[in-house]
Structures are given as structure tokens and as C-alpha cells.
């Protein structure tokens, strides 16, 4: 059976490539990719000779003639599908190719070779619950559409993950604050790269964290406690303290943890908790 190998590639750290992925890339004759320059650079870092390989740009797989063209390659050559970074098909035009092949040619086998994922890396680093999970990919560039789109998930109990570009980050985070009133948010910048950095804040806070506006971002919203979104800022803080104490964390430690996480004074949280009793 003919096989299309779908290969996840590093999202920043080349050392995260697996031996299985390297072998697939080395053995293949045709590479379907987003940008041949990016893929060639990756192969060069992996010491894989690409002189005899054919590179096919997959940005326009929505056109049927290109999909038919891809099918012919897969039938006659060893083929791999890659993204510029991470998993092909996740916010990537390769999804059209995989979907079309599955629906049109049952004789072609889809084989996924696992690897790095910005989605999973951001989700795990956030510390938020991992299920239910809602992945939104890249959001609309238009502010009104963005707000309306996020509002449709306001009452959906889940952890929400999406990607954002640096030039839209601040506007998007302000929109998140407008839609989600008392939610913890994680921002992962340049995940797995040399200057990787993490930020947490709550949407009830007046200001955004001091974020280095360079690189690529993963945004994670904790929307698991939707019944508490209407709480005031102080009520929310008390609720968070109690939530930690319910799992055995001492009051002092809970206040210290939240103070560090939310850039507040632990003494203020301690006083706030006692005033609520």
C-alpha cells in the first residue's frame, strides 16, 4: 500500500526531531511543504542531502488539480508531508491534502510520525486542566469578528488554546479581557526556543503583563469555571485561595503562590481572605 508520511517537525529546537522522523525525511523522494526554504534549512541542520528530493509547495491544495497532482506523486514516489513547524494539518494547509486523500483514495495510507506541538507545549506549560480542550488555531484579524467569535465560547466549559502573531498580540489580549471576565490566561512566547518565556495573568486585572513583543505566541485561557466569571475581582481572588486550600495547600502558601502568579502582594491576599470570612 502506498503511504503518505505526515511528519511533525521541531517548533524551535532542532534537537526535538525524532530518529523516526529523520529517517522518513532522509528516505523520501518528494516533500510536500509550506515553504521549501524553511524545509531545506531544516534538512541542512539535520545533515540530510536534499539535492535529489523534489519539493512541492502545499499552500494551494484547495485547488482540485493540485490535489490530483499530489495523488500521482504519492502513488509513484516515497512522500512526506511537513509543516514549517509542528504538526502538518494543525492550522496548516496540509489538512486539505490529508482530507482529500482519505475521501478519494482508500489505497493510500496516512502514517503520522509524532513530534513537537506548540498546542500541546502551551497547554501543558499553562498548568490548566487539559480536558475538555478547545483549539481555535489562528483567529480573525478583524477586531469585531474576533470578539464575536470568542464570545461564542464564553459559556463553554473548556481550556481554550489558540495561536497569535506578535503584531496582533496586545489587541487580542484586550479582546480576551473584554470577553472573559475572571479567567486565568497563559501566554507562551517562543516555546522550545532559546528565549522562551511564560506569562500568566487574570482577565480581571487592570493591566496586561509586561510581555516581550517578539516571536510567536500560544495563548491558553482557563474557562473551566464559567459559573464564577461574574465574580468581582476580590471575590475571584478569595475563590482562588479557597480552591488551593481545598486541595491541602496552607493559607500562607496559597497567598504566596497567587501573589507571584498574579503580581500581587501576599499580605493583601491574606487580609482579603480573612475579611471574607
From Swiss-Prot:
Pfam families: TP_methylase
Top-level taxonomic group: Bacteria
CC terms in the record's Gene Ontology section: cytoplasm
Cell compartment(s), UniProt: Cytoplasm
The keyword rRNA processing is annotated on this UniProt entry: yes
UniProt keywords, alphabetically: Cytoplasm, Methyltransferase, rRNA processing, S-adenosyl-L-methionine, Transferase
Its EC number(s): 2.1.1.198
Catalytic activity: cytidine(1402) in 16S rRNA + S-adenosyl-L-methionine = 2'-O-methylcytidine(1402) in 16S rRNA + S-adenosyl-L-homocysteine + H(+)
Primary enzyme class: transferase
GO MF annotation terms: rRNA (cytosine-2'-O-)-methyltransferase activity
Function: Catalyzes the 2'-O-methylation of the ribose of cytidine 1402 (C1402) in 16S rRNA.
Family: Belongs to the methyltransferase superfamily. RsmI family.
PANTHER family in the cross-refs: RIBOSOMAL RNA SMALL SUBUNIT METHYLTRANSFERASE I
HAMAP family noted in UniProt: 16SrRNA_methyltr_I
Entry protein name: Ribosomal RNA small subunit methyltransferase I
Lineage: Bacteria, Bacillati, Mycoplasmatota, Mycoplasmoidales, Mycoplasmoidaceae
Amino acid at each position: 500500500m502506498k503511504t503518505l508520511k505526515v511528519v511533525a517537525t521541531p517548533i524551535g529546537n532542532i534537537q526535538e526531531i525524532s530518529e523516526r522522523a529523520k529517517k522518513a525525511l532522509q528516505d523520501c523522494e518528494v516533500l510536500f511543504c509550506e515553504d521549501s526554504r524553511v524545509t531545506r534549512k531544516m534538512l541542512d541542520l539535520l545533515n540530510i542531502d536534499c539535492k535529489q528530493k523534489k519539493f512541492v509547495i502545499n499552500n494551494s491544495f484547495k485547488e482540485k488539480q493540485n490535489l490530483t497532482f499530489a495523488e500521482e506523486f504519492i502513488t509513484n514516489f516515497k512522500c512526506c508531508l511537513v509543516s514549517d513547524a509542528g504538526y502538518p494539518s494543525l492550522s496548516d494547509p496540509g489538512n486539505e491534502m490529508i482530507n482529500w486523500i482519505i475521501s478519494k483514495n482508500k489505497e493510500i495510507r496516512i502514517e503520522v510520525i509524532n513530534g513537537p506541538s506548540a498546542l500541546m507545549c502551551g497547554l501543558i506549560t499553562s498548568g490548566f486542566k487539559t480536558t475538555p480542550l478547545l483549539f481555535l488555531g489562528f483567529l480573525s484579524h478583524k477586531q469585531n469578528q474576533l470578539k464575536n467569535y470568542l464570545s461564542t465560547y464564553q459559556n463553554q466549559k473548556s481550556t481554550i488554546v489558540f495561536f497569535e502573531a506578535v503584531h496582533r498580540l496586545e489587541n487580542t489580549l484586550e479582546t480576551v479581557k473584554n470577553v472573559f471576565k475572571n479567567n486565568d490566561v497563559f501566554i507562551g512566547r517562543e516555546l522550545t526556543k532559546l528565549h522562551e518565556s511564560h506569562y500568566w495573568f487574570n482577565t480581571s486585572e487592570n493591566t496586561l503583563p509586561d510581555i516581550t513583543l517578539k516571536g510567536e505566541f500560544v495563548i491558553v485561557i482557563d474557562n473551566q469555571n464559567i459559573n464564577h466569571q461574574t465574580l468581582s475581582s476580590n471575590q475571584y481572588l478569595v475563590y482562588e485561595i479557597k480552591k488551593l486550600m481545598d486541595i491541602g495547600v496552607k493559607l500562607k502558601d496559597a497567598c504566596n503562590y497567587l501573589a507571584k502568579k498574579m503580581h500581587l502582594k501576599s499580605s493583601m491576599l491574606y487580609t482579603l481572605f480573612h475579611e471574607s470570612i
